[in-house]
Amino acid sequence: MVVTGEQMSAEEFEVVVVGAGQAGVAMSEHLTNAGISHVVLERARIAERWRSERWDSLVANGPAWHDRFPSLEFEGYDPDAFVPKEAVADYFVAYAEKFKAPIRTGIDVKSVTKNSTDAGFKVITSTGEIDAKYVVAATGPFQKPAIPPVVPADVSVHQLHSSDYHNPEQLPEGGVLVVGAGSSGVQIAADLRKAGRDVYLSVGEHDRPPRRYRGRDNVWWLGVLGKWDLATPPAGAEHVTIAVSGFAGGKTVDFRDLADSGITLLGLTSSYENGILKFADDLERNIARGDKNYLSVLTEADEFIAQNNLDLPPEPEAHVLGPMPKEAVNPIREIDLAAAGITTILWATGYATDYSWLNVPGALTDAGKPAHQRGVSNANGIYFLGQAWLSRRGSAFIWGVWHDAKFLADQIQIQRSYKSYAGSARIIN
């Protein structure tokens, strides 16, 4: 059941869930199943970021059989298909309707503070106040676009974040520099190149797992090799960019292929001065790092197949890599943007957290990040959901957030049980 902001009035709920993306919908399902009164507050529409903060040609990064909640399949799509973004958003709407999730849209949460008179919280919204015993921050990992302070905002070149990009037609005529070569950057660069644009792609450190290998998708390999359930990231991998895509039916990202398509590859974007953008001499090293990751996955997969006596077709050609792109061997260290005809810089540089509305002592670190264990905050009664590595590698993904939501609902139920215990005491002589 979805209602709009004008229907809001002062109320009390046991739980307020902030955000109605995949995390908020999953949280609502488990709270509903536990019989816990709650409301989900969403500033826009259900799964809004899928609709308005992603480019038009975006598809899910995993196949339909995997990137979903357990009890509802994607209707009308092959299990191995990569579902378009609008259909993903529609999926969450349908899922919420399936169990009549108490979602209220068009409501902006302004602040959450501790009540002065009891152990609960006061939630200030754009339409009034709500008292809650527990608050779940389910605003996800994509909160505040992060643009490095490299190019001043007042230069003549047009600058935008990937969250504001929708299609090539919205950009000024001319070449485009895409900064960032993760899933978003490589897909947007390919989208622009397909439209006939001159495209430059600044490539930093990254992993690039195979899309498919020996008849199985990357998500399957991550599962059987135990990587989805890693509780902590490997050393140095906390913020590694992952270049994987469902674009064009799903192909392994290889920067050699992008170069062959006419995209000019560059190293890490480092500095800007007087119309000149400079790049680090690290492109060859960054591509080599990605290749090493790619080959390591193939090796682990081959070993798993042998150990488990699986009948999966050999794929020796997957181990053969082509020569380094010419820009890696003879790197371009600087570009005069005007002379190169570059009129747009598109920053595919990720997101920062934004919990400026959560004003509860102990809930956040000094850096403004969640202070928690498996989503249970250091501040009693506050919970976090949808963040990368919340409990495991899969925590920020559709299926992973569903399992984390179940855990948090269980924790809330446990706290309710303790707090409802009346108890008795008697003196023993």
Describe the function of each predicted region.
Residues E53-D78, D217-P234:
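N-terminal glycine-rich dinucleotide-binding loop that anchors FAD/FMN and/or NAD(P) in oxidoreductases
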Residues V2-R49, F82-N429:
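Flavin (primarily FAD) cofactor-binding/catalytic cores of flavoenzymes
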